[in-house]
Structures are given as C-alpha cells and as structure tokens.
C-alpha cells in the first residue's frame, strides 16, 4: 500500500465529506518519533516529530492530494510491544474515533515468546475492529545485521542480540506471524519489512 492507495482508502472511509480524516498510528518508539536513545528510553531519546514516518506521510499525502487534508494521531510509545496497547488502546485510540488506525509492532516483541506477540497483536486488531475502526498493518524496519565498531560500549551486547534476531530468522518469524494475523482478518498490509529485505539483499 502506497500514498495513493491510502488516499483512496480514506476517501472510502465513513467520515463526513466535509470533515478531515483522522489517522491514528499505534506503535513503538519508531512511531513515537525516537531516532536514537543514548541511555534507556524516554527523556534520554532524541525525538524528531517532523521527521517521524507518519509526519513524512502526511506531507506526501498533501502533495499528492492537497484537497484531502489528513490529521495524524501519534499513539506510539517508546519501548512498547504489542501487549502494551491492551492497557491504553481505549484511551489513546478508540476514544478519539479515528477513521483509520495503522498498527506497527514487532521490534520489541522479539524479546517475548512468539505466542505472546500473536495473541497480543490479534487482540489489538480485534478491539479496533469491534470499535468499527479500519486497520492497516505496517510491518517494521529490519534490525541491524552486525555490530558496528563505533557502537557505544553500553549497547554492544544488545546490538549483538538484535543482530542475531535478524540473521537467525527470528525477526522474519514475527513479521510472518503479523502478516498471517492480518490475512486472517482481511487487514491490508503496508509491507515495509519486505522493502527493507529487498534493499538489504541488493546491497
């Protein structure tokens, strides 16, 4: 799904013709807007809310179709996994009545058992569906494939772990599980992960 597909999706959504569609983005630090974290998360992270992907998307949508303004609801939380929204989805998303919710989890979920991810993401999808909110699954970016020599010492051990998650196929398994859950529910998929894999394979 690209920008033009999203515009068509929004045009067909059930919001007033004179209104402005609200698109919620539910996810982790990538959705929140964190670009680097020097120690832990939260205040120690560098956030750029103008460069976060959904802000870039909003600008692109305006460029493609400037007569259909789109409002963005950032419901990303740094460090979150798919089980995190189960405690906050009513307040952070459903109560705001978005016309569409884009869901993006997996990067932190690889630290949990795969079945926990499946169950949690499935419940997120089902609760949004029960509230009448259409969903798009956005698959995540790849993890690192090696530990760069300039990696900050305190992060080297975890960088080795995430490189193993990526190279061993663990990350692939979680993304495949998300795709399967979406397919079972006829949820459209914006497959960023597939693009990353293609780029990595091309060098």
Pin down the residues of each PLM region.
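Short, solvent-exposed turn/loop segments enriched in Gly/Ser/Thr/Pro and often Arg
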Residues: 76-78, 141
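Short, histidine-centered active-site or binding-site loop motifs used for metal coordination
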Residues: 27, 76, 105-109
């Amino acid at each position: 799904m690209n920008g033009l597909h999203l515009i068509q999706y929004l045009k067909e959504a059930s919001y007033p013709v004179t209104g402005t569609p609200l698109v919620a983005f539910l996810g982790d630090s990538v959705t929140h807007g964190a670009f680097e974290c020097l120690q832990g998360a939260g205040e120690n992270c560098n956030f750029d809310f103008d460069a976060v992907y959904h802000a870039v998307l909003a600008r692109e949508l305006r460029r493609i179709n400037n007569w259909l303004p789109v409002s963005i609801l950032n419901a990303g939380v740094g460090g979150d996994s798919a089980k995190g929204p189960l405690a906050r989805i009513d307040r952070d998303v459903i109560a705001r009545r978005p016309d569409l919710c884009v869901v993006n989890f997996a990067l932190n979920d690889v630290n949990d058992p795969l079945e926990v991810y499946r169950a949690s993401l499935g419940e997120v999808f089902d609760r949004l569906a029960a509230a009448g909110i259409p969903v798009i699954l956005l698959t995540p970016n790849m993890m690192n494939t090696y530990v760069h020599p300039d990696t900050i010492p305190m992060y080297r051990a975890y960088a080795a772990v995430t490189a193993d998650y990526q190279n061993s196929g663990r990350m692939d398994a979680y993304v495949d599980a998300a795709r399967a859950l979406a397919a079972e529910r006829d949820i459209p998929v914006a497959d960023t992960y597939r693009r990353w894999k293609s780029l990595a394979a091309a060098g």
